[in-house]
Amino acid sequence: MLDRFREGTWAFYRLGERSAFAELARTLIDAIPADDPTLALDLERLNAIKRARAEAAAEYFRENAARWHEIRSLHVPEQDVEAALLKLLPTCGIQDLLDLGTGTGRMLELLGPKVERALGIDLSREMLAVARANLERAGLRNCQVRQSDMYQLPLASASFDAVLVHQVLHYAEEPAEVLAEAARVLRPGGSLVIVDFARHDQETLRTEHAHRRLGFGDEEIAGWLFAAGMTPGPVVRLPGDPLTVNLWPAVRNAAADATNIAQAPVPALSTSGVT
């Protein structure tokens, strides 16, 4: 009934989405009275934990906004990631680009000159202040940034040709919801690229840098993409020491039926390396 994902010293559980018992589990949950006192206490505690995590992440961003590039460089050379991204993302013909969790706006600086319009979304005002300064310095008038929650984008459906999720998914409490929202704003045939860490056991990234997830597995990402109405492409891997950065590309299906897609088996993903 449950899927279990081990990450360092933590383990996450969620309802199995593809098992034969998934429907039974949902039925049992629906049968629990909404006013059950034990359930109410559990939900109250869960919300408190989520608030504490959000506050810790916000504080981390406030303390590190000015040296964000320096922190990222501790994990993997950014120039390697950027070179791989430029090879992977078909920037030619892109009118509207969305960068979720834009941070200092580096991805807008990189891709802005290659697209007609680009928008960066971030929840941190400190990060947005840095991004605005960087974009102004680069003279990128076609790029803008906006404060918004990546779970509830104030954007019309099917309004972007490409969406980038660069080193932000590991901060998300619900990565699948982030990808579903990214898919919603993508036009049919639009491109999505996720840049994040492969699964690892570097617990300090959770305890000292507010990472909610210690990387991701290919099948995990593929399942979320299919459920959101997207088709995954070959994974690009950039091995590092000790972390590996993966680039997971996907294309928005022309006529996505998320329910049917979510029930389809996830095929094995081919991979490629970039040196």
Protein language model regions, located:
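Amphipathic alpha-helical dimerization/coiled-coil segments
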Residues: 19-67
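Class I SAM-dependent methyltransferase SAM/SAH-binding core
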Residues: 96-152
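Core SAM-dependent methyltransferase catalytic element
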Residues: 237-275
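Conserved alpha-helix/loop element of class I SAM-dependent methyltransferases that forms part
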Residues: 75-95
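A short SAM/SAH-binding and catalytic strip from SAM-dependent methyltransferases
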Residues: 161-174
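A short acidic, Gly/Pro-enriched loop at the edge of an enzyme's catalytic core
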Residues: 151-162
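A short glycine-rich, Lys/Arg-flanked "PGG" loop and its adjoining helix->strand segment in the class I
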Residues: 176-191
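C-terminal alpha-helical "lid/dimerization" subdomain adjacent to the S-adenosyl-L-methionine
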Residues: 191-248
